[in-house]
Amino acid sequence: MTAIPFEKGLVETGDGIYAYLQPDGGWGWSNAGLISDGGQSLLVDTLFDASLTREMLGVMADATGVGADDIGVIVNTHANGDHTHGNGCCRKAEVVASEASAREMAELPASELAAIMAQARAMGPAGQYLVDIFGSFDFTDVAEKAPTRTFTGELNLKVGDKRVDLIEVGPAHTAGDILVHVPDDKTVFTGDILFIEGTPIMWAGPVANWIAACDRIIDLKAETIVPGHGPITDVHGVRRVQDYLRYIDQEARKRYDAGLSVRDAAHDIRLGDFSSWGDSERIAVNVSTLYREYAGDTSAPDVVQLFGLMAELKQ
């Protein structure tokens, strides 16, 4: 595959297949996709706020003639707001997600994120870190729309004559991650199973599921692989994500067995080549999730504390 420049905007990757890219691929700067055939259109994910989503939909309409009200289906690859907060901008669309993602969306509405951001400057280093990474987004201007159709396992859709396969691979990054595969066009939209040139963040785990999800992507033999964040990639990019996951699992396990705390382990792990990836401080969340996995602890993490640790590691 010829390398596609990582520039903001819409790129046609195949016949009626488009990726919308948002550099730099860091916190909140996610990718989306459009699949169009025979007068039907499916949108893969929306963006972190309504303004960004409307801008994207305008670019898509100008390039393809497919307007917001022409989109019949939105597929959310997972529950995070940077992939869902613009769902309501497509008023006529059915919204499809995994059952697990639908539950997660209901648990953290945008209003809660807006409330946290309103208090962020009073939250010390963790709050300042939140301002630094999320200050560009307007969580008071969102267009939420809950899934109207959910599934587990796999779901096969048709967009015109194109077959679109939804493949559940979570829990991994989140509880309900899915892949969107267009087999005839050898294209897969991976959601946040792939962060390319950025550090993966594991909110859910287990890590083995995420590694297996990467194997599933490889097995699809897609020629165009659109990640949730970062530039369009190929199998090499998928394997590098696997390398990272295996490495941090190995390194976190050593420190867990040695009795180090999450904080000490996150500071102690040397990232080597992976240190050049953006947002390397996400090691804090990854170690926390791995430690809870090792301990069989299913309780929710202290998210504010984790953002504080990421702020500390960022310095």
Functional labels for PLM-detected ranges:
Residues 13-18, 134-140, 160-166:
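Short Pro/Gly-enriched beta-strand edge/turn motifs at strand-loop
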Residues 40-42, 46-51, 156, 163-254:
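Metallo-beta-lactamase
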Residues 52, 58-149, 156, 175:
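Active-site HxH/HxHxD metal-binding segment of metal-dependent hydrolases
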